[in-house]
């Protein structure tokens, strides 16, 4: 649950940072740039914490997609940017994509408790893909006969 909170904080920080960038470019104030630097940095830190348990593709899609949606809404309200029918169609498509990516995520049935949080070894990956256990798999190429 905490990792989803990290993702939410990453999204909020990205939105604030990006809107601050626009504010700084419109107003010329240095404060906007300072806020932008801190928020974008914080966003990446929070995102890196979130992807420890949230699938990277899902986390990135939500982080970027939700950010784009909210930034677009605030850009229209605060900065007078226009929202053409084509942009609206793009945003609707984006929402559909986010929903598909999120709904396509499922948890593994049984975690690999024997290896903890470390990534699988090369041998474990070979076993998973070939179904052979250590010492049983025959490497492709030459077969050696016993002399």
Curated annotation (Swiss-Prot):
SUPFAM superfamilies given in the database record: Multidrug resistance efflux transporter EmrE
One BP term from GO: spermidine transmembrane transport
Localisation per UniProt entry: Cell inner membrane
Family stated for the protein in its record: Belongs to the drug/metabolite transporter (DMT) superfamily. Small multidrug resistance (SMR) (TC 2.A.7.1) family. MdtJ subfamily.
HAMAP family (alphabetical): MdtJ (MF_01598)
Keyword set, alphabetical order: Cell inner membrane, Cell membrane, Membrane, Transmembrane, Transmembrane helix, Transport
PANTHER family to which the protein is assigned, alphabetical: SMR FAMILY PROTON-DEPENDENT DRUG EFFLUX TRANSPORTER SUGE, SPERMIDINE EXPORT PROTEIN MDTJ
Role according to the record: Catalyzes the excretion of spermidine.
Record keyword Transport present: yes
Record protein name field: Spermidine export protein MdtJ
Subunit structure: Forms a complex with MdtI.
Chain intervals for the UniProt region annotation (Disordered): 105-147
């Amino acid at each position: 649950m905490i990792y989803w909170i990290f993702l939410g904080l990453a999204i909020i920080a990205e939105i604030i940072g990006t809107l601050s960038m626009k504010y700084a470019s419109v107003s010329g104030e240095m404060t906007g740039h300072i806020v932008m630097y801190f928020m974008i940095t914080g966003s990446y830190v929070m995102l890196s914490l979130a992807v420890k348990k949230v699938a990277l593709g899902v986390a990135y899609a939500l982080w970027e997609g939700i950010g784009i949606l909210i930034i677009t809404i605030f850009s229209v309200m605060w900065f007078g940017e226009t929202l053409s029918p084509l942009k609206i169609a793009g945003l609707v498509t984006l929402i559909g994509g986010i929903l598909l990516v999120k709904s396509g995520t499922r948890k593994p049935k049984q975690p690999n408790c024997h290896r903890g949080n470390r990534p699988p070894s090369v041998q474990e990956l070979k076993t998973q893909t070939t179904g052979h256990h250590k010492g049983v798999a025959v490497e492709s190429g030459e077969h050696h006969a016993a002399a």
